[in-house]
Structures are given as structure tokens and as C-alpha cells.
Design a protein with these regions (language model features):
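P-loop (Walker A) phosphate-binding loop of NTP-binding proteins
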Residues: 8, 20
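A glycine- and Lys/Arg-enriched "phosphate-lid" helix/loop adjacent to the NTP-binding pocket
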Residues: 42, 89-132
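Conserved lysine of the Walker
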Residues: 13
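Short, well-ordered beta-strand core segments
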Residues: 69, 84-86, 131
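Post-Walker A alpha-helix
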Residues: 16-17
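Hydrophobic anchor at the beta1->P-loop junction of P-loop NTPases
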Residues: 5
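NTP-dependent small-molecule kinase module
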Residues: 100, 125-170
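ATP-dependent small-molecule kinase phosphotransfer cores
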Residues: 25-79, 160-170
């Protein structure tokens, strides 16, 4: 099963992927993989981020071989995978995390708003009928992993969305 592990930058994707690796998942860091495959096509100086050609990267996704693979990154839901895990986080906690990492104020605000209005969830829902959304705000990384792993993706017929609504934060 090839699973996109996605969410707004700062929600805990890298931390969760480390837990998943301890539980037998192979992890693909999408940003590093894109660079290795020559799919970084530029730099967005305003966002201080690499621009990744996800269409080109999509052609490099390996066929499903039955192993458990997590493609970790905020663009992973744009890849042709089998399912998606979407991590959500209280936007105020997200803003604290991003500020502590030195993100510019405008970028913190942009990601705060993106999380509050479900941008990545909506994009992922458009691509994945097998999707699980969980709120990581009050969960330890191990508990968050369990909340995702306890859902049988193979038999999932419709998205499994834990209730999350932060629109009142805008």
C-alpha cells in the first residue's frame, strides 16, 4: 500500500513518519526524492521553497508491490498513490511551531489560514476515496500513528474524517 502522508507544513508529518518507520513502513521523503530524481524545477523566493514538478515526479512512483510505503510531504497527495493520511493541527499550535522554526510572519499567516480552511484536506479528498484525517493537536506521535494505523485502508470505501473545524479562528 502506497500512502500519501500529507498536511500543512508544520503539522508533524516528519515526526509521524519516524514513528511509522519503527512500525515497518518504508518512508519516502518527497522533497528529497524530488531533488534526487531531478524534479525540482526552480525556487520560489517569495515562499522560500523549491518548486517541484509533481507531474514529472508522478511518473516515477513505483507500482504497488504490497509493501507499506509512506510518501511524506505536503505535496504527497498530488502523487498517484493508493490512499492518504492527512494530519490536521490547531492553527494556533501550527503558528507557534512555524514561528519557532523561524518562518517569516507572512508564511506563518499563510499556513495558519490554509490549515483553518482545510486546503490540503480538500485537495486530497479530490484524489483519494481512501483517506483518513486525524487531528494531531492533543495526541502524542505514537497515539497519532495508532489513530491512523487502526483504520484498515484496504477495506476503506469512503473517507474516514475525524471532525475538525477551525474556521472560527479566521
Amino acid at each position: 500500500m502506497r500512502v500519501a502522508l500529507t498536511g500543512t507544513p508544520g503539522v508533524g508529518k516528519t515526526t509521524l513518519s519516524a514513528v511509522a518507520a519503527r512500525h515497518g513502513w518504508r518512508i519516502v521523503d518527497v522533497k528529497a526524492w524530488a531533488a534526487k530524481e531531478g524534479c525540482v524545477v526552480g525556487r520560489d523566493e517569495a515562499d522560500e521553497a523549491d518548486v517541484i514538478d509533481t507531474k514529472r515526479l508522478s511518473r516515477k512512483v513505483a507500482p504497488d508491490d504490497g509493501s507499506k510505503i509512506l510518501y511524506e510531504g505536503h505535496l504527497s497527495h498530488e502523487l498517484p498513490l493508493d490512499a492518504a493520511w492527512v494530519i490536521r493541527l490547531d492553527p494556533e499550535e501550527l503558528a507557534r511551531r512555524l514561528a519557532s522554526r523561524g518562518y517569516p510572519t507572512a508564511k506563518v499567516r499563510e499556513n495558519f489560514e490554509a490549515e483553518a480552511i482545510d486546503i490540503i484536506l480538500q485537495e486530497a479528498l479530490a484524489r483519494f476515496p481512501r483517506l483518513v484525517q486525524r487531528d494531531g493537536t492533543r495526541r502524542s506521535p505514537e497515539a497519532l500513528y495508532k489513530a491512523f494505523a487502526d483504520v484498515g485502508l484496504e477495506s476503506l470505501k469512503a473517507p474516514d474524517l475525524e471532525p475538525v473545524d477551525w474556521t472560527d479562528r479566521l
